[in-house]
Amino acid sequence: MFDKQEFVSKLVTEEKAKIVLLVMDGLGDIPVNGKTPLQAANTPNLDNLAKESDLGQTIPVLPGITPGSGPGHLSLFGYDPIKYQIGRGILEALGIGVEVGEKDVVARANFATWDGKVVLDRRAGRPATEESAKVVQLLSEKIKKIEDVEITFYPGKEHRFVVKFTGEGLGDKVTDADPQKEGHPMVWAEGLDEPSKKTARIVNELIKKIAEVLKDNPKINFALIRGFSKYPDLPKFPQVYKMKAGAIATYPMYRGLAKLVGMEIIETGQTVADEIKTLKEKWNDYDFFYVHVKKTDSYGEDGKFEEKVKVIEEVDAIIPEIVSLNPDVLVITGDHSTPVPLKAHSWHPVPLLIWSKYTRRGLSQAFNEFECARGTLGTIHASDVMTLALAYAGKLEKFGA
């Protein structure tokens, strides 16, 4: 079977270059009252950049397939998201520094609100990180083991936390214990092979125990657990692309994904401005920077149009600071679309901008979904973005005679 990444890696040179991949999570959208958030936002810097760039749109997995953030990012990093199917749990776990061994299965969890039958709020009202941490501590004190499996809880950001299951004979081919939508009955975990059936049984029992411990909490009284995974084996980004790579991201899952592919995690603050300050401070230490902005996705999922617009404008304001660093290539895109009307990830193509001195500049006037749809790059698979970035950076040899 043809491995595109392996093929490209043989053409990568040792040529030094600086590449910035700025990912606005869930960037793509569809019009509300005639405009998408990208169109409605005041983005003079992104629009000026578009005039000097090649634009296009990406398909993260396949046309019509709605990707999770894991597949969306893996694709942007040049990995085949179908070949490398990774549970979100390992990403979240690595992102908060959880040690994962051979006997471990890790999963991502949300605190939720339910009435005993129906899940009312999949995020329990998005509690503050500090409040969630206290609940995680309570669970750690009350629940330590189910059957012969040790249970360990780790706090994450806001409503998120990680569960590690440690024991013999555990599998990770487990369906999500999550109805995926509010107002629906609970969907319990199911194992798809014998080892995973054991894991699913433990997971479902754990959720019932969590509900019992939290029964007096009016908001945080339930948990949804998904993204079950063991530690996967992936080719490492620095070896594939011959670049020292650093990741600047505030949310654990994205830090975990970057760590999984071999990027170094760069500590940063909580705001977009903090992330760009970190980028400038560490500019001489890395060849490739992955910078992640989360809130475009969060507000898309919450159906908050104006808030998504404001995050886009916040990013626009820092574009001159990135350009002033004079990267050889600046890529701006998303990992998937999260349309405000849908309040969820979607299959829609994702806007893509590539800026370098070798672009066919002057053909686009603004950065939005519709300019990108008729851009010079056309519609490409997201896993080709890295190949293009390397080409624009002068890091690929000619193929063939």
From Swiss-Prot:
Keyword Cytoplasm listed? no
Enumerate the UniProt keywords alphabetically.
Answer: Glycolysis, Isomerase
TM region(s), chain numbering: none
**Catalysed reactions, semicolon-separated:** (2R)-2-phosphoglycerate = (2R)-3-phosphoglycerate
Q: What is its EC number?
A: 5.4.2.12
Q: Which residues form a coiled coil?
A: none
InterPro entries, A to Z: Alkaline_phosphatase_core_sf (IPR017850), ApgAM_prokaryotes (IPR023665), Metalloenzyme (IPR006124), Pglycerate_mutase_ApgM (IPR004456)
Q: Name one GO molecular function term.
A: metal ion binding
- What is its pathway? Carbohydrate degradation; glycolysis; pyruvate from D-glyceraldehyde 3-phosphate: step 3/5
- Biological process GO terms, please? glycolytic process
Q: Which PANTHER family match?
A: COFACTOR-INDEPENDENT PHOSPHOGLYCERATE MUTASE, METALLOENZYME DOMAIN-CONTAINING PROTEIN
Function per UniProt: Catalyzes the interconversion of 2-phosphoglycerate and 3-phosphoglycerate.
Family classification = Belongs to the BPG-independent phosphoglycerate mutase family. A-PGAM subfamily.
What is the official name of this protein in its record?
Answer: Probable 2,3-bisphosphoglycerate-independent phosphoglycerate mutase
What organism is the protein native to? Thermotoga maritima (strain ATCC 43589 / DSM 3109 / JCM 10099 / NBRC 100826 / MSB8)
